[in-house]
């Protein structure tokens, strides 16, 4: 294999929406950094049966709805 082709993996902390912290190996950030998730499998409608609503933290959902409001979505 070629040297210095792939980034180095290190352990980071991933903070779930319920406050739980999970250690994972990743190329994101630096060793020991914490990645806080806005949405994870415990609250995502795809894994919870669709009953939960997504939080519109970045305004993307409302922007999409406004753009396509005449199509009846």
Swiss-Prot record:
Stated role: Binds the 23S rRNA.
A Gene Ontology biological process in which this protein takes part is: translation
Query: Which keywords has UniProt assigned to this entry?
Result: Ribonucleoprotein, Ribosomal protein, RNA-binding, rRNA-binding
The lineage is:
Bacteria, Pseudomonadati, Pseudomonadota, Alphaproteobacteria, Rhodobacterales
Quaternary state and interactors: Part of the 50S ribosomal subunit.
Q: Where are the transmembrane segments?
A: none
Give the family from UniProt: Belongs to the bacterial ribosomal protein bL31 family. Type A subfamily.
Question: Do the record's keywords include Thylakoid?
Answer: no
Q: What superkingdom does the record give?
A: Bacteria
Molecular function terms, GO-annotated: rRNA binding; structural constituent of ribosome
Q: RNA-binding: present as a keyword of the record?
A: yes
Cellular component per GO, a single term: ribonucleoprotein complex
Name used for this protein in its record: Large ribosomal subunit protein bL31
Q: Looking at the Swiss-Prot or TrEMBL record, what is one Pfam family this protein matches?
A: Ribosomal_L31
What the entry lists under InterPro entries is as follows: Ribosomal_bL28/bL31-like_sf (IPR034704), Ribosomal_bL31 (IPR002150), Ribosomal_bL31_sf (IPR042105)
């Amino acid at each position: 294999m070629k040297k210095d082709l792939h980034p180095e993996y290190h352990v980071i902390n991933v903070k779930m929406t319920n406050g739980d912290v999970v250690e994972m190996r990743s190329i994101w950030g630096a060793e020991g950094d914490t990645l806080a998730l806005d949405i994870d499998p415990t609250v995502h409608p795809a894994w919870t049966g669709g009953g939960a609503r997504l939080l519109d933290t970045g305004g993307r959902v409302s922007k999409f709805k406004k753009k396509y409001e005449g199509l009846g979505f």
